[in-house]
C-alpha cells in the first residue's frame, strides 16, 4: 500500500504539465500523421520541436519527448511550441523529410497569422528529429 501511495505522489508531482494545457492540433496535410500540436505560450518566442524515434516509431505526444522539452524549457510559461508529427515507418524514407519541410512552411505562416516573432524561432529535435531539424536548417 505504501508503494502505491508513493507512486501516486510521484505521479502528482512529476507528471507532465504540458498535457494539462489546452493544445490546438493543426493539419498541414491529408495524412493522419501530418499534424502539428500547438502549445501557446506567454511571449512571442517560438520553438519548433521535432520528435525522434529512429524514423520508424514514436510520435509528437509521446511522454518521453514532452518530458525532455520540460526539462530544458519553461514549457507553456514562455515559449509557443509547435510540435511536428510526420509520417514514419518502413519504406517511408523521403516522407519524414518532406513532411517536416511542409510542416515548417505551414508553421511559418501560422507564426505570422498569430503575431508571433518571426525573428525568434528556434528549431530543434532529438534523435531522428535532430536529423530532420538539421535537414531543414540546411
What do the PLM-derived regions correspond to, one by one?
Residues 92-111:
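Alpha/beta-hydrolase active-site loop
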Residues 108-123:
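Gly/Ser-rich "nucleophile elbow"/oxyanion-hole loop immediately N-terminal to the catalytic nucleophile
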Residues 54-57, 61-62, 81, 106:
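Serine-hydrolase catalytic-loop signature spanning alpha/beta hydrolases and amidase-signature enzymes
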Residues 61-82:
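Short amphipathic alpha-helix adjacent to the substrate-entry channel of hydrolases
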Residues 137-138:
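Conserved small/polar residues in nucleotide/adenosyl-binding loops
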Residues 44-54:
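Short beta-strand element of the alpha/beta-hydrolase
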Residues 19-42:
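N-terminal cap/lid segment of alpha/beta-hydrolase-fold proteins
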Residues 125, 129, 133:
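Gly/Ala-rich beta-loop-alpha elbow adjacent to hydrolase catalytic centers
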